[in-house]
Amino acid sequence: LTGIFISLEGPDGSGKSTAAKKIVPQLQQLSTQEVVLTREPGGSAIAEQLRDIILDVHNSAMDARTEALLYAAQRRQHIVDVILPALQANKIVLSDRYIDSSVAYQGAGRQLGMQEIWQLNLFATQKLLPQLTLYFDIPPAVGLKRIQQKRAQAADRLEKEQLDFHQRVTAAYQQLIKQDADRIVKIDAQQTPDQVVADCLAIISQRFNLGD
């Protein structure tokens, strides 16, 4: 694979989705490679249908293992439809969430076991990992407060979970960072949005020698 694969991770309300939209045009100026922004859950037609099922607030009866399997399923389809073709075409793929989200949210948040969810997703992804993951670091209470202020009515099924769920998610992310410090780089997500974007671009440029 000749392209570059970057994922953005973080708790709910960390601002990564907003930052991603700003990073893309600036990253495009630094690189001759086409930049593709995608997201999980979703990113392609079938995966977006699975997203709707996963995040629907009416599906409160969904079993935790079902949820984990659906996330793995949408990820597989997203890889086949979007990520692999883009990487094979020498593009830069920026994915808003990827495998670490499942390990943190289903492994720790839902208490299914981080190792079990990691194994499930290695099967789904055929071990395709990003070369770089930017982790938007923010205390869970701050992230949830942002969601309540901005879009409380539109919060999805996982965003509506209690604080202890989100604390387990954040603790799991910190554990993943320790285990894979080469791949996962922390960004201070409590800075101004512009500073967050600037930090992301600096790390990406340095890691992949862009804009020299």
Residues of each region from the PLM?
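A glycine- and Lys/Arg-enriched "phosphate-lid" helix/loop adjacent to the NTP-binding pocket
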Residues: 101-171
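Hydrophobic anchor at the beta1->P-loop junction of P-loop NTPases
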Residues: 8
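NTP-dependent small-molecule kinase module
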Residues: 22-24, 141-212
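Hydrophobic positions on the alpha1 helix immediately C-terminal to the Walker A/P-loop
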Residues: 19
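Pre-Walker A (Motif I) flank of P-loop NTPase domains
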Residues: 2-5
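P-loop (Walker A) phosphate-binding loop of NTP-binding proteins
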Residues: 11
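Conserved lysine of the Walker
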Residues: 16
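ATP-dependent small-molecule kinase phosphotransfer cores
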Residues: 30-125, 199
